[in-house]
Amino acid sequence: MATKEKQIIDYFDNIGSHFILDGVPIMEVKLPDEVLDEWLNWSKKYRKWKTHNLSFLKDHINKGENTFQISISTNDLENSINLPFTIRLGEYFMHRLHGLSMVRLRKCITLRTHLGHHDNSDYWLNYTNIGDSNPIHVHAGNLSSVIYIDNVEDTPTYFVLEDGREIRYEPKVGYVLIFPSNQEHYVKEKETDKERVTASFNLNFNNTRYDEAKGDSISHEEVIIKK
C-alpha cells in the first residue's frame, strides 16, 4: 500500500473510529477540533437565514421536519478542511467495511452535488427546535451521515436494522456517524427548548471507476454497498 494511503488509514484508526455494533455498518468517528470549529462557525453564519423572511426559498427540503435546513455554499466547502475530511472518511469507511483498496479508491468517493441549483450540494445544516422531528427515512447517494454539532445529547438517533431491531444512539457533540445511504433512521419529536444543531452529507461511490482503477485486485461484486 502507498505511504499516503496508509497515513489516512492510520489517522482514522488513531482517532478511535469504530463500528458501533458488530455486524452493523454504522461507524462512529470523533471530529478533529478544526472540523468541529468549522461546523460551529457555519452554524452561526447560516443561522441568519433561519429567521429571514425569505428563508423558505433557501431551505434544504427533504423528509425532515426540522425548523430550518440549509446547504453549505460551494465557496465555504472549497475553502474548508471539512470537505477533504469527509471524502477521506468515506474512503476509510469503504476500506474498513468492504476491504477495498485505498489506492483504488482515489477519486471514487465524491460529494453528491446539483450543478446550477441554489441548493447545490448534499452537505447541509439542520436547526431543530421543540416540536420538530425527523420521521423514518433513508438518504440519496451511497454513503450518508449525521454530524452532531451543538446541544444534541437530549435527542437520540434511532436506526432500524433489516431484521427489525432498532438501535438507539445517544449522540455526543463533536462526533459523526457514517453509514450506507439506504440505512433507515429517524429522530423522535424534540421535547426540549434549546436549539439542536446537526448536519449531514451524502456521498456517491463510483463503482465503475473503482473497478477500472489500477492497484490491489478485488472483485467487482465486493464493491456493491449493502446494509
Regions found by a protein language model. Give the residues of each.
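Non-heme Fe(II)/2-oxoglutarate
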Residues: 2-115, 133, 217, 226
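Surface-exposed beta-strand edges and flanking loops
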Residues: 31, 72-74, 127, 161-162, ...
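Catalytic core of non-heme Fe(II) oxygenases with the double-stranded beta-helix
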Residues: 113-189, 194-198, 202-217
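Structured alpha-helical
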Residues: 222-223
